[in-house]
């Protein structure tokens, strides 16, 4: 399927615009994280079939005229190993399904694949997380060379991962407009150059 033309761009003033008509991008939606962490577990508590719940949620969102979602995906906890190798599991399969279903409904997405907050919140009862976050705490993600390599590895594998529902790599999904590398990274005001290298 190959490269996907960019639907948006940033102008010289830092405003994100649609490539097609040059209008400012203005989307409305919310965070959505049923494929992982607390929402994944909550669906299990009520005996829900997660794929059907995704469809029902997206139908509600469309009825409310939502056109944007921030996909919070705890890959740093639930879908990687220490080196950042992508792990195939139900969380990833549900993310693929969610992306395909959102795409069908013309819902645009911001993908946030490194969340940094423990995926076991609020219960904190499961200690089986295998992800890179188990080895690299939030405050090491920007400066620690091993942590940076693990994140680079994870991001490359995730963005090149082929979605079986769409047949496209995540990097080529037309409705994923943005990728937020690290959710709420630790700030180091005494080392601004080190934060933006």
Task: Please report, for each region that a protein language model flagged, where it lies by residue.
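Active-site mouth of glycoside hydrolases
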Residues: 7-197
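Boundary at the C-terminal end of the N-terminal hydrophobic targeting segment
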Residues: 2-4
